[in-house]
Each structure stands twice: as structure tokens, then as C-alpha cells.
Amino acid sequence: MCYIEITKDNIEDNHICCALSTKQYEHAVNEKKRWLKARMDEGLVFYRLHERAKVFIEYLPANEAWVPINAPNFMYINCLWVSGRYKNNGHAKRLLDKCIADAKACGMDGIIHIAGKKKLPYLSDKHFFEHMGFTLQDEAAPYFQLMALTWNGLADSPAFKSQVKSDSINEKGITIYYTAQCPFAVGMINDLRELTEKKGVQFQSIQLSSKEEAQKSPAIWTTFSVFFDGRFVTHEIMSINKFEKLLNTLA
């Protein structure tokens, strides 16, 4: 199988796997491309299958990652995604092997990734990572698990930052934290705002626009996290209909 690396030089001529057949999110895809190009200056690497498919890995040094974690000298996997008919063909392992090789070449102590305690949309299946030798390093409510593959036994253990342990914020109504990392998050935010305000519920969205903001965030899943009356509700980027059902149970 042929994989290609997406770089600043070729990104405008290549798809980035996200929202492949959704024309309405084209502006959000372009925003993610701009985000990726900026992160590439900070060490982000993006490999994908050389097909029109959602098969890719995206990783960068953990100290540059847009997540509230402490993991000096580790590589952080933003996303490892293999979908549809491409599952169960060894793609995830081969893409992970590229990350491992890069991390070792950089003299790092290991690799980390956030997975779900159970199978959940947009979160990796922890069982694959356990099979690949990853072990649990830290947990945060309600279902986030920080997994690590470590080859330096003297390395400090990766951990979530303390501010995410409370699982709450001091805000009323719906509050959504998000970044440009996922086109679906950027593409949906205005529709979610319109629906929420129509129902008479207070709404605010906070787009994290820097590494520093993301690392200080109260949301573990900075790509997209929904809070209601200060309590974390979900990381799932929902359709309008599904989000309306959620609102009906909350408000």
C-alpha cells in the first residue's frame, strides 16, 4: 500500500481525508488546511493512504499539541483514522509504525494518545492501542483515557493537566470549546448556535486559537467539547437533529 506525506508544499493539491464528500464544509476544510500548515512548522506530520479514503495519521511533539497534557519528550497522536472498507487491512498498524519510527528518530521517550474508556464516536478504540503495547497512564471523567507506548523506562509518566480533573466550568447554558482541527466542528458551530438560541438557551462558542489556549483549556477534547450549565456533556460532533434531542434532555 502506498502512503503519502502531506506537506506545506503539496497540501493545496491533496485532500486531507476529512469531509471528503460534503461540499458544505469546504470552507472548514480550508480552515483545517491553514491550521495544519501552521502546525507543520511546529513538527506536525500527516500521512494518508494514496487513495480517496479516510485513512490517515496526524501527530506532533506533545509539547506542541493542542491538548491539556503533561508529556515532555513524547509524540502525541492527534488522530489515527481508518474507515469503511479499509478497516482490518493493517493500515492502522502501518501508519502507527511511521509515528513510532519518527518518534524514535527524534530521540523521544514514547508516544501518547487519548482514547475512550468504551467505544465512542470520534475517539479511538483503546483495545487496538492496548494490542499495540500502549498502557493506561491517566484518566479523566467521564471516559477519557491517556494511553502511552513507552520505550524509555526512566521517562516521566504522561498525565492530564490538573484543570481538566474537575470536569466543569463556571458558565451557564451551552458552551462549546473547539479548534480548527476538525472541519465538522467548524462547519457545524453556527447551526448549533442558531438551534440553541431558538430554544431560548444561552449559547457561547470558544474557538481555541493557540497552543497556549488549548493547553490551558478546561476541555480535554479541545477539538470539540460541549458543556451545559458548567458540566461537561459530550465531545461528539452531532447532527442538528441529534443535538436538538440532546438539548431537549438538558434544558
From Swiss-Prot:
Entry keyword annotation includes DNA damage: no
GN (gene name): yoaP
Name by which UniProt lists this protein: Uncharacterized N-acetyltransferase YoaP
Enzyme kind, highest EC tier: transferase
InterPro entries: Acyl_CoA_acyltransferase, GNAT_dom, Thioredoxin-like_sf, YoaP-like_dom
Entry's family note: Belongs to the acetyltransferase family.
Keyword tags: Acyltransferase, Transferase
EC number: 2.3.1.-
UniProt xrefs under PROSITE patterns: GNAT
Residue ranges occupied by any N-acetyltransferase domain in the UniProt entry: 4-152
Pfam families reported in the protein's UniProt record: Acetyltransf_1, YoaP
Signal sequence residues: none
One function term, GO molecular function aspect: acyltransferase activity, transferring groups other than amino-acyl groups
